[in-house]
Amino acid sequence: MKILNKILIGSLSLLCLSSCDFLDETAYNKVTVGNFYTTKDGITNGVNGLYSTLRGMYIQEYLIYMCEGPSDIWIGHQGHEQWYNWTIDATNADVRSFWYSCYKSVNQCNAVIESLENNDIPGLDEDLKTRFLAESLFIRAHYFYHLVQQFGDIPMPLKPTNSVLLHIKQK
């Protein structure tokens, strides 16, 4: 009985110790938006990453679908009846992908812009900071231009977001 009591007490002690907060560890190697754009290398990689988002717009043929989708170039393709018949709506996968890709890239631009405007990044001189800010603003404007061309009045978030925004003022 004494052995059973010792085992029971030991098990309960271990169970109670597992809920202590001193066992929680901070992941120092995890990259987040909060710590990614705090160094010169991080902000440089962030700006370079903005250019890789343009690949989706041009290589994945979003602009071809948006500009030439209803023309006779796409007649032979199956699954493009909405384009051919001019009955494209928000349920179209190409339209949704274009919208999502553009706003995902706008959010990345906003994160870089906010970091450049609000953080004093060690090792980043004023000329490089100005260049990175100009590149980020231009790429964001590029996406807004294509969104406005395709959809008209659109929401234009100018701050990075982590969740769905249901109410954004139009500019």
Give the predicted meaning of each segment:
Residues 1-29:
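Bacterial Sec-dependent N-terminal signal peptides
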Residues 20-64:
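Membrane-proximal, proline-rich intrinsically disordered regions
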Residues 21, 58-59, 73-76, 147-156:
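Proline-centered turn/helix-capping motifs that create local helix->coil transitions or kinks
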Residues 23, 31, 36-37, 69, ...:
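Short clusters of hydrophobic/aromatic residues that line enzyme substrate/ligand-binding pockets
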Residues 34, 60-79, 158:
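Short, surface-exposed recognition loops and adjoining beta-strand edges that mediate ligand/DNA contacts
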Residues 44-48, 52-53, 79-151, 165-170:
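Conserved, well-structured interaction surfaces
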Residues 160-161, 171:
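Hydrophobic, small-residue-rich alpha-helical packing segments that form membrane-like cores
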